[in-house]
Amino acid sequence: MKRIFFVALISVLLAACGGKDTYKIKGTVEGLEDGTVVTLNLMGYNSLAEIDSAIVKNGKFTFKGETDTAEVAVITFDLGDNIGGCEMYLERGDIDVLINVDKGFQRIGGTPNNNAFQGFVNEIESLNDEVQELEDKIRITLASQGDCTDYYKQMGELQDRYKKILSQNIYDNAGMLHGYRQLMENYTLFEPEEVMGFLEELAPAFGGDLAFAQLTAITNAQLSVSLGHPYVDFEAPILNKKGGYYETTAKLSDYVSKNKIVLLDFWASWCTPCINEIPFIKAAYKKYKSKGFEVVSVSVDEETDEWINAVKDNGMNWVQLWNGDDDMDNSAAVKYSISAIPSTFLIDADGTIIGLNLRETELEEALEDYFKNK
């Protein structure tokens, strides 16, 4: 899933008891020449703040200092054509860092947050290899206009495995910055009920943080449009049947009231996962439109030209609405607390949300069950 809105990530600083404590970073680096300068930086929101530097000697470097917080840090070094980096947590204690520039990997440990971080990396390494291999197969198959249905199913299974590992990692480290950061960077992968469960676990350590309050507000809003709740109406600019956009608008209620079941689909032209879902939506629309199924797609594209061209290129011959500018407080995406796309809501004739984020063949299966019982 592709994020389109961001929480101001982790403003919290974990206060350590008894004032400042010392840290020592012992680094070993392979693939860097002696004399290379390595820099220790604190990670801010979209920026790095340098706090120290060291010189590589005999393949090693050291940083020493004091800290009263646990913070996200990055060790950087100049590779000539780009900047290399090693992400870690700066906290009290002895921190061990191993960097292999040529092979492109890092190993960190020695302190609680860094041990937790490395443990998570170890768990998902083989999973990442499987994902990369499957993405290559999908790319080749799509290029030859082949059928990727089985590959998409396998990708879904890999995503489920990743979520399970990530979920356990958050719960196991709920009292540490690593666990909090994992949630803040990955909450869009989970359903609102799951996020609320994480927040309850994290509240004792992080409940007073601004980002925690923001995510809580977002999650509560998402719960208001979750399974079993009534849909929320909105009005948005509509693309006419000739592919023109003339500032005319339509309401979601216009379609919910006229059809037996409606799929509300948030997407964008630049979102590859969204584009990958279109063939499945098209197949379901073709099969069930005559029975009372309608699709209402809402684009979160910033530019209307990109939206209109994508609709034409992908043959999306159902209702097309535009979310409008990101700063519209009354937009559809705001009302539905959309933090990632694609996001879909299946709404029945009574206006009740009966399905969320149905992927690939799940949509057609849900429609088959729905009409079978009607």
Model-based region annotation:
Residues 1-28, 374:
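Bacterial Sec-dependent N-terminal signal peptides
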Residues 17-164:
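A non-transmembrane, solvent-exposed segment enriched in polar/low-complexity residues
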Residues 56, 238-239, 347-348:
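Short, acidic, Ser/Thr-enriched surface-loop or helix-capping motifs
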Residues 83, 95, 106, 156-230, ...:
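N-terminal targeting signals for export/organelle localization
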Residues 235-262:
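A short beta-strand-turn-helix
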Residues 266-283:
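Conserved redox-active cysteine motifs that mediate thiol-disulfide chemistry
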Residues 286-328, 334-341:
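Conserved segment of the thioredoxin-like fold in thiol-based oxidoreductases
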Residues 316, 325-372:
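Thiol/disulfide oxidoreductase modules built on the thioredoxin-like
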